[in-house]
UniProtKB/Swiss-Prot annotation:
PTM summary: Processed by the macrocyclase-peptidase enzyme POPB to yield a toxic cyclic heptapeptide. POPB first removes 10 residues from the N-terminus. Conformational trapping of the remaining peptide forces the enzyme to release this intermediate rather than proceed to macrocyclization. The enzyme rebinds the remaining peptide in a different conformation and catalyzes macrocyclization of the N-terminal 7 residues.
Official protein name in the record: MSDIN-like toxin proprotein 1
Main function: Probable toxin that belongs to the MSDIN-like toxin family responsible for a large number of food poisoning cases and deaths.
KW Coiled coil (keyword) present: no
Any one GO molecular-function label of the UniProt entry: toxin activity
Length: 32
């Protein structure tokens, strides 16, 4: 599963930098 996650994470962030930047703080607050 590490392989898929490592490939999906960077690809998603690269394809959706705007969304990633907006979701980043949300995930940090809810995840932590």
């Amino acid at each position: 599963m590490s392989d898929i996650n490592a490939t999906c994470l960077p690809a998603w962030l690269a394809l959706c930098p705007c969304v990633g930047d907006d979701v980043n703080p949300t995930l940090t607050r809810g995840g932590t």
